[in-house]
Amino acid sequence: MASSSSVPASSTPSKKPRDKIADWFRQALLKKPKKMPISQESHLYDGSQTATQDGLSPSSCSSPPSHSSPESRSSPSSCSSGMSPTSPPTHVDSSSSSSGRWSKDYDVCVCHSEEDLEAAQELVSYLEGSQASLRCFLQLRDAAPGGAIVSELCQALSRSHCRALLITPGFLRDPWCKYQMLQALTEAPASEGCTIPLLSGLSRAAYPPELRFMYYVDGRGKDGGFYQVKEAVIHYLETLS
């Protein structure tokens, strides 16, 4: 009986040191400051460097300010310039510098007789004053002084995308007009929309046989057919872009 009563007495003092040790470790852990793992810090630091190299602003990076590199603390203006688009707009019209329109000096050469100079000037004024700002060649205004007539006529055609033929009774009587008409057909036999006959003061029967394979603009309208000539020139220029 004496031996059985001695067992509780010996086990009681052995539990108290273990409880004290457990309490000491618990207090030590509670007092230990929390610290971010090294692997996580290095991961965030690498992320801030990657964002800086890609041109992103510091506010878009996931790293806190204390872990960001000096290079990532750039000014807002430098960040916005890094994100600005460098490619030009995709939209291109007939007036753009990338258009084939600028491969020649003029958009249209107005061919007319001497007695139709006033009508030719009105047509040129209409085309140049339009929203498209078409570049016109008018012989009396744009031909080089002292230049040979044949050379000037040929150069005017070769330096222009389109040819507007102001076909009138005076045009049919002028040998230079007929020469210019035949030269225009030689450079573009199939026309392809670049030769635009404007019939004015003539019947359909008087239409030159050399041009009867292509449609002409009727100049008997209220605007003298100027609008149709302008639209034909613009349509041809759009095929060049």
UniProtKB/Swiss-Prot annotation:
Residues 1-102 are annotated as: Disordered. Pfam families: TIR_2. Residues 1-14, 57-99 have a biased composition (Low complexity). It comes from Mus musculus. This is Toll/interleukin-1 receptor domain-containing adapter protein. Adapter involved in the TLR2, TLR4 and RAGE signaling pathways in the innate immune response. Acts via IRAK2 and TRAF-6, leading to the activation of NF-kappa-B, MAPK1, MAPK3 and JNK, and resulting in cytokine secretion and the inflammatory response. Positively regulates the production of TNF-alpha and interleukin-6. The gene is Tirap. It is found in: Cytoplasm; Cell membrane; Membrane. One of its GO terms (molecular function) is Toll-like receptor 2 binding. Residues 104-233 form the TIR domain. Homodimer. Also forms heterodimers with MYD88. Interacts with BMX and TBK1. Interacts with TLR4 and IRAK2 via their respective TIR domains. Interacts with EIF2AK2. Does not interact with IRAK1-1, nor TLR9. May interact with PIK3AP1. Interacts with RAGE/AGER. Residues 39-56 have a biased composition (Polar residues). Its main location: cytoplasm. The keyword Transmembrane does not apply. Keywords: Cell membrane, Cytoplasm, Disulfide bond, Immunity, Inflammatory response, Innate immunity, Membrane, Phosphoprotein, Ubl conjugation. PANTHER family: TIRAP (PTHR22662), TOLL_INTERLEUKIN-1 RECEPTOR DOMAIN-CONTAINING ADAPTER PROTEIN (PTHR22662:SF0). GO terms for biological process: 3'-UTR-mediated mRNA stabilization; cell surface receptor signaling pathway; cellular response to bacterial lipopeptide; cellular response to lipoteichoic acid; defense response to Gram-positive bacterium; inflammatory response; innate immune response; myeloid cell differentiation. GO terms for cellular component: cytoplasm; endocytic vesicle; plasma membrane; ruffle membrane. Phosphorylated by IRAK1 and IRAK4. Also phosphorylated by BTK. Polyubiquitinated. Polyubiquitination follows phosphorylation by BTK and leads to TIRAP degradation. Disulfide bonds join C109-C154, C162-C194. InterPro entries: TIR_dom, Tol-interleuk_rcpt_adapt_Tirap, Toll_tir_struct_dom_sf.
